Amino acid sequence: MKKQPSIFGGACIIASVCVGAGMLGLPTSGAGAWTIWSAVAICLTMVVMTLSGWLLLEAYSTYDLRASFSTVTKDMLGSTINAINNLAVYFVGGILLYAYTTASGGIIENLIKPWIDLGSSGLAICSTIFVLVFSYFVWHSTRIVDRISVLLIVFMGITFVISIYGLAANISLDTLFDIGGKEGDYAKYAIGMFPVALTSFGYHHSVSSMRAYYGEEQKAKYAILGGTGIALTLYLIWVFVIFGNLPRDQFAPIWESDGNLDVLLNSLGNVIESNTVKQMINAFSIAAILSSFIGVGLGVFDYLADFFKFDDSKIGRTKSWIVTFFPPLIMSILFPLGFLKAIGYAGAVATIWTCIIPALLVYKSRKRHNTTEFRVGGGNGLIIFTVLFGVFVAIVHFLAMFNYLPSFKG
């Protein structure tokens, strides 16, 4: 009898998709809102993103287990909406892979620079090596991604605990709550945090993979909840210990670099005395990027395989691998962009397929099928709220992009 996949394994895949972006982007994007309001924004986003993932599961439940986001959207909403959704999914998945590739190349280059100086080509070389080595797991199979994700989550857990222990020992409550800060109006900055927070829970392109993996909706539902729950817990602890160590006004150079990870790590290193803690934070950050790179890569890989109708043979998977990983790598080499800026763009576009499309799919599905075995509670109220949340986040990003929202610069 074939062994059933564990819910924990699926939760680790979902968490691994989420954690990279959040760990790297949330502290900087939340610097204006600071501790309390950052926590409010992160928690609200987690709840909405979990429910919208469940809405997708409900929409999928009347289709074959191999049916993908693209297949269901085309059948329910038509070719035009599906084309828009396809572009949005690929844009977000691609820009996340691009951001992780660029960030990883920069970290690897800095790590080896004391021994090997690759000069002006260092970032491109390190980014290419990173992609060629770690995209292999996605090419191989979902099962190996499951196993690697579990190993990475365990490794992240160990390095996270050591990092948090070291950082927590030096937390200053005055720093954590910005006592005596020059500016005490935090709430106005919380709105601008939502695009990054939404991207931090953007696992939805992996929902069809989870359903196919388990062969049912109920286990996939719990895997999604477990994954977003793991991500939320890690995010809150991570943000709190960073805000408790790194004063609010010291985020200025991080903002100036558009939230680049190496600048954040260097800033943290300047306030941490223990070399062991510094090394653990670096190791944790690399594992967070790698886990998210693999998780996002799996979702985009399966999505494009269905879109282009590539089969599951080695040749077919190689074609899927090329269209998944090569375009982001080429863009990373030619146009390296600030990490936080890239994540913000991803968040704005992700509202289409994390909020708006799932709600519309369920609305159409319920009109077509009066009853289904798997059904999310909340009625039309949840559908409307999910759409409004997505529209709100998209508007926030574009207002911030044109400087119509308060922007904290340290």
Predicted segments — roles?
Residues 1-28, 50-54, 66, 189, ...:
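Membrane-interface "cap" regions at the ends of multi-pass membrane proteins
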Residues 2-7, 120-129, 216, 226, ...:
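Loop-to-transmembrane helix boundary motifs in multi-pass membrane proteins
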Residues 9-18, 86, 111-141, 155-163, ...:
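Transmembrane alpha-helical segments of multi-pass small-molecule transport proteins
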Residues 27-58, 230, 407-410:
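Extracellular loop-to-transmembrane helix junctions
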Residues 51-62, 66-117, 282-306:
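Hydrophobic transmembrane alpha-helices that form the core helical bundles
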Residues 64-79, 229-289, 310:
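TM-loop-TM module centered on a large, flexible mid-protein loop between adjacent transmembrane helices
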Residues 116-129, 140-143, 150-266, 405, ...:
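Helix-loop-helix junctions that connect adjacent transmembrane segments
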Residues 156-166, 289-299, 323-327, 346-371:
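Hydrophobic alpha-helical segments of multi-pass membrane transport proteins
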